[in-house]
Regions:
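Conserved C-terminal alpha-helix-loop-beta "cap" of PLP-dependent enzymes
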Residues: 1-8, 22-157
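Catalytic-loop motifs flanking and including active-site residues across diverse enzymes
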Residues: 10-17
Length: 157
C-alpha cells in the first residue's frame, strides 16, 4: 500500500530537552506553542492562496501545523513546482517539490512545516520570495522545466 510519511530523526539530547520543556511549560504552555504554529501556518496558506496559481491541499488547520500545496489544474503556469523549489533555493529556502507515491505519481506538491521558532516574519519573507519567483517566471518563462531528477528532492517510494 502506498504511503506518505513524514520522517524526522532527532538526537536523544533534544528529546531530553523537549521533556524538560514539557515539564516546565506544562500542557497549557505546549498548547499555546502549538496554537501559535497553527496560526502561522494558516496565515501562510491564506497569503499563498491569494497569489493565484496554487491549490492549497492542507492549510494548517488541524493535524500538523503544515501547509501543503500544488499548482492549480488547467493552463500553462510557465513553471513547475520543481522550478519554484530551485528558485527558492537560490534565496536560501529549502522547500522541496516531490511527487506522491505510486498511484498518485502525477501529483507534485510542496510543503512547509511550521515548528516552534518559525515566526510570522519568517513566513512573510518566504511569501515575498515566492512572489518574487512568480514575477521572474512571468517575465522570463521557463523554456525547459526541471525534471524531478534534475531538481533533486525527496522520494516517498
Amino acid at each position: 500500500m502506498p504511503t506518505f510519511a513524514l520522517n524526522f530523526s532527532r538526537p536523544a539530547g533534544q528529546i531530553v530537552s523537549q521533556y524538560y520543556n514539557f515539564l516546565r511549560l506544562g500542557f497549557e504552555g505546549y498548547r499555546k506553542v502549538q496554537n501559535a504554529c497553527y496560526h502561522i501556518a494558516q496565515h501562510f496558506a491564506a497569503e499563498l492562496r491569494k497569489m493565484g496559481p496554487f491549490e492549497i491541499i492542507h492549510d494548517g488547520n488541524g493535524g500538523l501545523p503544515a501547509v501543503c500545496w500544488t499548482l492549480r489544474d488547467g493552463g500553462d503556469h510557465g513553471f513547475t513546482l520543481y522550478d519554484l523549489s530551485d528558485r527558492l533555493r537560490t534565496r536560501g529556502w529549502q522547500v522541496p517539490a516531490y511527487s506522491m507515491p505510486p498511484a498518485r505519481e502525477d501529483l507534485v506538491v510542496q510543503r512547509i512545516l511550521v515548528r516552534h521558532g518559525v515566526t510570522r516574519d519568517h513566513t512573510d519573507l518566504l511569501l515575498e520570495d515566492i512572489q518574487r519567483a512568480l514575477a521572474l517566471f512571468k517575465n522570463h518563462p521557463v523554456s525547459r522545466n526541471l525534471t524531478k531528477t534534475e531538481a533533486g528532492g525527496y522520494n516517498h517510494n
